[in-house]
Amino acid sequence: DVNTDIFAYLCGNLVETIERCDTEAKAIKLVLNRLEKWKTMFSKGASDGLSITEQQGLYGELMYLHKLVLRGIFSYIDTLKIWVGVDKAMRDFQGKDWAVEAKTISINNADQITINGERQLDETLLDKLYLYHLSVEASRMNGQTLNDKVDELRRLFADDKAALNVFNAKLMEAGYFDHHRDLYKERCYKIRKESIYVIDDSFPRIKESELRDGVSNTVYSINVSTCAEYMVSENTHFNSIE
């Protein structure tokens, strides 16, 4: 049973994490935090499913995840650990010294992307930071659905039960539950354009160090049509994170 496998994975993961705690106080705090996280996760299963924006965002993250898996740079499990967007982390993919923020847009002005916070595109503490920009056209019954992309990755992990359990657990953390699949079966995505940009010191974005004291939680837009000079090929990008 898939749900039993996922629950077993969650419990096993909790036990492993507790074993690494060096004090009882840390272990108790970790358990309480993890239980709160599980409560939030399972409450999503009782909701009305993902919003259109959330569906689209998850689709984009899965698109990048699929590319990363196929490159074979890391094991399946390690690749899934890199996918931290479901944990509401600052960026969607976090490696040892690199990170990727994924943005999926389906509106008319597909080059206009919203950046949430002054740290999201701040590379100060990283060797490499990238922006994965996916422009899609959403329609009914013409393209790939979110369910299709989920199933594609599940087939990829089918022979690695541990990886499949991690993937399914992360889907639940993202708010994707199989009993909601009917809600997503008619919204399809066709890729209009996908690009990867390297974020360096001259890239047009806000850095935390540039803000005046008292200014925080900034939300701003970038027009990536002006950022062609920062575009890199997929090969260049993936070779740089090996």
Q: Model-predicted segments: where are they?
A:
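Nucleic-acid endonuclease domains
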Residues: 1-88, 105-242
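Conserved catalytic cores of phosphodiester-cleaving nucleases, focusing on short active-site segments
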Residues: 68, 93-106
